[in-house]
Amino acid sequence: MKCPYCAYGESKVVDSRSTEDGSSIRRRRECLKCNRRYTTYEKIETTPILVIKKNMSREYFDRNKIVNGLMKACQKRPVSRKQIEQIANEVERHISNEMLTEVNTDKIGQIIMKNLKKIDEVSYVRFASVYRQFKDINTFMEEIKNLMDKN
């Protein structure tokens, strides 16, 4: 790895430790030429996951899209950022556990709705209305009736 200060190609590791979440290793390095120190992070390289959209186009999985969609659905509701992050984590965990390289939006939506329903039913209906493309008030009423029947 090249030194960011002098571009010399050799360094020694001064300190190495796992990050808080255990997903990467933080290393303090010292350049063998200029003796300046810098930090690097080592992370496992993962295979990119493709999302198959409803129109059959494909795009790279983007966790931020899930978080942003949930933020909109949970706006002005008693749902914390931490809970939203946990739902996004659950989606990633599910995809990872099944070792999928491609996943359709339907599967992602189902995982989100299953988890969101446990946290806040109003946010769940909001999310479902966009995800399932509710066309009219009757569709909203049917979904609310289903929720009430299950409670």
From Swiss-Prot:
It comes from the Bacteria. Keywords: ATP-binding, DNA-binding, Metal-binding, Nucleotide-binding, Repressor, Transcription, Transcription regulation, Zinc, Zinc-finger. InterPro entries: ATP-cone_dom, NrdR-like_N, RNR_NrdR-like. It comes from Clostridium botulinum (strain Hall / ATCC 3502 / NCTC 13319 / Type A). This is Transcriptional repressor NrdR. One of its GO terms (molecular function) is ATP binding. GO terms for biological process: negative regulation of DNA-templated transcription. A zinc finger (unnamed) spans 3-34. Belongs to the NrdR family. Its cofactor is Zn(2+). PROSITE patterns: ATP_CONE. Signal peptide: none annotated. Residues 49-139 form the ATP-cone domain. Negatively regulates transcription of bacterial ribonucleotide reductase nrd genes and operons by binding to NrdR-boxes. It holds the Pfam family ATP-cone. Binds 1 zinc ion.
